[in-house]
From Swiss-Prot:
Residues at which pepstatin A binds: 83-85, 371-375
Similarity section: Belongs to the peptidase A1 family.
UniProt gene name: SAP9
Alphabetized GO MF terms: aspartic-type endopeptidase activity
Organism: Candida albicans
Name of the protein this chain belongs to: Secreted aspartic protease 9
Keywords: Aspartyl protease, Cell membrane, Cell wall, Disulfide bond, Glycoprotein, GPI-anchor, Hydrolase, Lipoprotein, Membrane, Protease, Secreted, Signal, Virulence, Zymogen
Amino acid sequence: MRLNSVALLSLVATALAAKAPFKIDFEVRRGESKDDLSPEDDSNPRFVKRDGSLDMTLTNKQTFYMATLKIGSNEDENRVLEDTGSSDLWVMSHDLKCVSAPISKRNERSFGHGTGVKLNERELMQKRKNLYQPSRTIETDEEKEASEKIHNKLFGFGSIYSTVYITEGPGAYSTFSPLVGTEGGSGGSGGSNTCRSYGSFNTENSDTFKKNNTNDFEIQYADDTSAIGIWGYDDVTISNVTVKDLSFAIANETSSDVGVLGIGLPGLEVTTQLRYTYQNLPLKLKADGIIAKSLYSLYLNTADAKAGSILFGAIDHAKYQGDLVTVKMMRTYSQISYPVRIQVPVLKIDVESSSGSTTNILSGTTGVVLDTGSTLSYVFSDTLQSLGKALNGQYSNSVGAYVVNCNLADSSRTVDIEFGGNKTIKVPISDLVLQASKSTCILGVMQQSSSSSYMLFGDNILRSAYIVYDLDDYEVSLAQVSYTNKESIEVIGASGITNSSGSGTTSSSGTSTSTSTRHSAGSIISNPVYGLLLSLLISYYVLV
């Protein structure tokens, strides 16, 4: 049987659509919170100085990565914050109620140690029941009354991270100990909060929206901002790819100003407190056959860039140098047999001196959470002291950070971080120096709380690496980044990464591999089905 050209073209198109790379270009925005995002043309990290050049309070201007979604048959446009440290998508309802965070909380956005999401006693008790009494679903009156008593007794507050989930995974709080790290406040600036300035979704105008008959959606942050609403599912278009029946939440009341696209592990979905998980965006992309594996690669770009990208189901070999090295994510909780957050082992950290020698500031395996939602990085006290000493910095109690020589902003020295798998990422010290005033510079590495079991690397470290997140196999692959606008993209099959060699350099990108097929200018696609169908199509045209 002979196929005509139209049929063959249709097969080619179908093959490409089924397993083609799915790329989201995001814009970089800065702000103290999601209520205080920077103007469109301002993507540089910002800090607020008060009360003198040294005796000052610095307000962390966080980093946000914003993507555009079109939701429902009405294609309501929403700009949301991409977050690798949370796992739920939620957007604003068209008629939601905008509320303000308490003034006392808004005034505490500093470098103080935040605990992330604040859970009340009722929620803490529920998490213990989920772990040890999975069949029990009814709360006692005593448990309900307990929520009135806890407030901030167990958990402090602060707005140093931008991850915004309410759950830490099943059993996370079985010992009622505060866990400090990836999570943080969402914002809430007061009466000027319009809530819908970055878009909203009108469920009544979408013919394809279905409301879930489940518990309400609820997220609460350490700075007392929150969002509550309903769960549902609808068609969501991202970068010209439509995901059918994607589960997400619609907020009816919030003190935040923008929704969130969480793409983390399913163990961090807010529904885990109700003993179930669902297919968030990475998992749904795989389930629908849009990508072959729940995997994405992240390119944060340079410190002053206004845009970056995330590539689902594929790797851009032009964006890194050398080889990708894969490390297993670490288990977060002893009670859980799998990781619930993206945490990897770091073996050692060295600081390069001006003479070329190195000073070791960390040795021995230490868990580190990779959180692109955090502008700054947070390490343990002894590591921070060693880093400050190596850079001849002076610790300022009033600032809560090391004051360093501003000449380091132009330094070519690096901090060398060896991850598990013997992969070393070189981080320019200049990326870790923040200008607080004309004559004062701050080290953008802060002290992690002593109650935390892990350190945290934010985007000032992570932008030096090209990182591939494999949610199926709980793996992370890393390589030294190569900053370039060129692309050499390979689709990843169900078996995972097969080609781990980068074609990028510090000045230019490389070329394609011999097994790749040219798909479009500047893009390399490795897809056997596409190659076979394209060969059939070429043969057909030759024969006729």
